[in-house]
């Protein structure tokens, strides 16, 4: 397992752990009906959360190779691995088209 896959997995765990807290803080920060003092306080709390707990830091990677580009979200595998597995018949319901 490559280091990038391990790092990405740790980020995914952090995102899951802090997701509700982050959503709560963001909702309070963006609520214009609240006083600025409270909004600023929650903005500060939001900035104190771990940086890797943000969803934008998670990268879709192939679960077999760790390749970060051209990954099919539905299968979480890269186009290269997808082609190999599809030609072997390892993916259920996927077959080469012919007409």
Curated annotation (Swiss-Prot):
<dbReference type="GO" id="GO:0005739">
    <property type="term" value="C:mitochondrion"/>
</dbReference>
<dbReference type="GO" id="GO:0005840">
    <property type="term" value="C:ribosome"/>
</dbReference>
<dbReference type="InterPro" id="IPR018271">
    <property type="entry name" value="Ribosomal_uS14_CS"/>
</dbReference>
<keyword id="KW-0687">Ribonucleoprotein</keyword>
<dbReference type="GO" id="GO:0006412">
    <property type="term" value="P:translation"/>
</dbReference>
<comment type="similarity">
    <text>Belongs to the universal ribosomal protein uS14 family.</text>
</comment>
<dbReference type="GO" id="GO:0003735">
    <property type="term" value="F:structural constituent of ribosome"/>
</dbReference>
<dbReference type="GO" id="GO:1990904">
    <property type="term" value="C:ribonucleoprotein complex"/>
</dbReference>
<protein>
    <recommendedName>
        <fullName>Small ribosomal subunit protein uS14m</fullName>
    </recommendedName>
</protein>
<keyword id="KW-0689">Ribosomal protein</keyword>
<dbReference type="InterPro" id="IPR001209">
    <property type="entry name" value="Ribosomal_uS14"/>
</dbReference>
<dbReference type="Pfam" id="PF00253">
    <property type="entry name" value="Ribosomal_S14"/>
</dbReference>
<keyword id="KW-0496">Mitochondrion</keyword>
């Amino acid at each position: 397992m490559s280091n990038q896959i391990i790092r990405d997995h740790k980020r995914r765990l952090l995102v899951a752990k802090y997701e509700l807290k982050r959503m709560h803080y963001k909702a309070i920060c963006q609520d214009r009906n609240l006083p600025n003092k409270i909004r600023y306080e929650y903005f500060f709390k939001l900035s104190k959360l771990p940086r890797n707990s943000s969803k934008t830091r998670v990268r879709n990677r192939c679960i077999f190779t760790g390749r970060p580009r051209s990954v099919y979200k539905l299968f979480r595998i890269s186009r290269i691995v997808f082609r190999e597995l599809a030609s072997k018949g390892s993916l259920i319901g996927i077959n080469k088209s012919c007409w």
